[in-house]
């Protein structure tokens, strides 16, 4: 696969539009670009001998949210990619990429419904919303919503956000993904605690 060409196509279709009203321009592209890398990192940790999966995983990661805004975006994304990449991939590669995109939102970790590649993409996708990116998402969301003070971020993290954290962790397929998730959440909570303290005019 020619990933320079594929990245240019991804930029053309995602970098210069908004997929959510409360997200920054190009958020879908930047998310997909990160997932295209992290899904391969995750594969190396879990299946170090399976490098032959990487091109398909990387391509699916790069385009998995191209359907955002046309819901269900997993289905619309697979349809769009089948047309967009028909001259870029072999028919076998295209079929595999589209199956991965179609499956990426169907998280059922306690079943054998999905194969290893599908589970890898699901986990890489979910993990990208946490850690440093989680703090970025929180701050941009509150800014777009017109919230007025920093204290609302820690109020969420130490309140209703706890249940959301638990639910998202339960969606992960692999134990190592849960370990990565836990580390990311600890970072977010440490930042939220500092925001809570400094938001009241105090010091650590």
Q: PLM features: what roles do these ranges have?
A:
Residues 5-8, 34, 96, 160:
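Generic alpha-helical secondary structure signal
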Residues 85-86, 105-108:
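Short secondary-structure capping micro-motifs at structural edges
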Residues 90-98:
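Membrane-interface starts of transmembrane alpha-helices
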Residues 1-18:
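Short alpha-helical hairpin
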Residues 25, 67-71, 87:
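Short gly/ser-rich anion-binding loops that grip negatively charged ligand groups
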């Amino acid at each position: 696969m020619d990933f320079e060409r594929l990245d240019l196509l991804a930029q053309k279709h995602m970098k210069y539009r908004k997929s959510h009203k409360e997200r920054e321009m190009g958020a879908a592209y930047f998310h997909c670009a990160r997932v295209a890398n992290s899904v391969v990192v995750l594969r190396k940790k879990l299946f170090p001998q399976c490098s032959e999966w990487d091109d398909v995983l990387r391509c699916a990661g790069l385009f998995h949210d191209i359907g955002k805004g046309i819901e269900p975006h997993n289905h619309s994304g697979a349809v769009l990619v089948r047309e967009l990449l028909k001259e870029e991939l072999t028919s076998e590669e295209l079929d595999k990429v589209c199956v991965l995109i179609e499956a990426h939102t169907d998280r059922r970790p306690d079943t054998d419904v999905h194969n290893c590649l599908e589970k890898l993409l699901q986990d890489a996708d979910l993990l990208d919303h946490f850690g440093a990116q989680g703090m970025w998402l929180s701050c941009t969301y509150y800014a777009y919503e017109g919230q007025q003070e920093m204290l609302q971020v820690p109020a969420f993290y130490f309140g209703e956000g706890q249940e959301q954290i638990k639910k998202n962790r339960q969606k992960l397929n692999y134990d190592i993904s849960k370990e990565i998730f836990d580390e990311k959440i600890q970072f977010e909570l440490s930042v939220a605690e500092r925001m809570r303290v400094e938001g009241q005019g105090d010091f650590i």
